[in-house]
């Protein structure tokens, strides 16, 4: 799906392309790709790079075209292997043509358009738009991090009532998401540090870049803190599981010892040897009493040693 936006003031939709407008392409169809490649003559590998979910944040030039790939947050199904991840957003520019391409429909881009319309100021130029996309991505990383923290706290509350596989698996998935976040944020920071020297930055852009740096730093540090907390939490519950397993094995071993003693005594009295009790009518009762006494003493000893 493609949309032509007039970047002046309230960001209105245009019926067709005009010079210096913004072409927003989301989940591009074959027709959209042909339009970009045939009409605007952008390098064909630009789109293939943007469609690669593992493409790192970077920029490059080819035949007058500039390609910027920014990593932005994206939410899958909550029960998926990595519910929160990042996807590439491509920014393509040449003279009076500015195009953004994303192969996923993200809340960030929807909110970006809505927010710019509320500002009712538009973009001063394509450089202003690029850095505002950086700012929006940082803000949305922070929003997603709050959601991740909420899920972590929920899983921890469930684990406080009893360790279960579902909550532990959920924490493991969130750890994977935080790994994707921290890697992408660092990549975006490196990209930003390079672009501010490559693009024509005016005084307003410099102020905007400072805001982006602040938000990016906060997002990176928050992700790092949550990742450390989650790792510590996982280690704690792993220790609890190991401790519970050791306690269970110790208890079972102690019970086995207590149960073994009557069997041992019965075996001794049951041997074909002279023991003075083979002809006594009280032999069985005597063996039974000894078994009970020995078992009780062993039980008391193990309880005293806190092995039961």
Segments predicted by a language model, with ranges:
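Peripheral, non-transmembrane regulatory/ligand-interaction domains of membrane transport proteins
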Residues: 1-197, 201-202, 211, 215-222, ...
